[in-house]
Amino acid sequence: MTTLTASPVAARENRVLADRLGGTIVREIALVAAGTIAMIVLARISIPLPFTPVPVSLGTLGALSVGTTLGARRGLASVATYVILGIAGAPVFTGTNVGWAFPSFGYILGYLLVAAIAGLAAQRGADRRIVTMAPTAVVSLFSVYILGLAWMIPFAHMTIEQGLMKGFVPFIIGDLVKAAVATGVFPVLRSIFR
C-alpha cells in the first residue's frame, strides 16, 4: 500500500520568501506585523490629485509586495490588519482619511484582492520568473479597481464614465510602472533567497 505525500523538496519549491525563516507562532505574528507596517509605510506615500478623490499611492505596490513575499494567508492577514486599524481610527490611510466613509475606501478594500491574488500566485511559483511575475503583477494591481470603482462611483454619485475617468484612467501608467518594478524585483529576490 502506498500513500501520497508531498516530498520536502517539492514543498520547498513552492514556498514564498517568508517561509525561509522557519516556523513558530511568534514568527507568524511577526511576519503579519511586518507586513502591516509595510502597508502603513507604503500607503502613506501618496500624491493627492486635484481632479479625483483617489490619490496616487504606493499602497497597491505594498499589497502586491506583502502578498508576494508572505503568501496569501499572511498577506491577507497583514492587509486586513491595516484596514481594521484605519477603520478603527488609526491614521494609517493616505491623507487625513480614517474610518470608511470616504470615496477612495473601496481601493483600500481592493488591497485585500491584490494581496490574495499575488500571494496565491507566489505560492505557485509565479514570482520566480519574469514571464510569470509580469501577468501576476498586472492582474493583482488592476484587481484593486474592482472594489475601488464599485465603492467610489455610488459614494461620490458618479456615472460609470466619470468613475472610470477619475478612478481608473489616471492610474493606468503608474500601475504599469509598479507592475514593471515588481516584475524586475521579485524574480531576483527569489534567485537570491533560494
Predicted regions and their residues:
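Juxtamembrane membrane-interface segments at transmembrane alpha-helix termini
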Residues: 66-69, 89-96, 177
